[in-house]
Structure formats: structure tokens, C-alpha cells
């Protein structure tokens, strides 16, 4: 159990740092009212989780590695709480079009990315 906690913690450490760097970099080059940085990390994370579970299902993967990537790294790399907060700000500012667009883009593109990732090892 301690090994799993340490592995998840280390994965979370790496994922959180990469999320911060990725969001800042993408938003620097694409400064829109919708955070494309948040959209980017959520799409990429969804694609990776599709890959991970497809690979684990078809080829096998150690529980520790699955915990490191799935729970640790991806749990901190992707961000539903930031997505929720950003949507709340869009709603409060009366920017209803961007609010709806942000939700639609995140939900559909993330599901599509997870599906594509899953297909690779199927």
C-alpha cells in the first residue's frame, strides 16, 4: 500500500508541474476568453488515459504503473476543477456563448480523444 501511495504521489507531482507549464505556454500563445491551455491538457490527458487502459486491457500493465500514470500523473495533469471555475467565471461575466462553447469543446473533444487513444491498442 505504501508503494502505491508513493507512486501515485510522484505521478501527481510530475503531472501537476507539467499541467502548470502546459497551460501557461498554450495560454501565452493563444490568449482567448476560453482557456485553450486547460482544453489542451484535458484533451491530451483523455487521449493518454484511452491509450493506458486500452494497453492495460490488451497487453497487461502492472498495477503500480497504472496507478502512477492513471491516478497520479493524469489525475493532476488534467483538471476538472479549473474547467469548472473557468466556466463559472464565463457565466458570471455574461459570456454565455463562450461558456457553452467551452463546455461543448471540453466534453466532446475529450471523449473523442479518449476513444482515439483506446482504439490504438484495440
What is each PLM-predicted segment?
Residues 1-122:
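Membrane-interface helix-loop junctions in multi-pass transporters/channels
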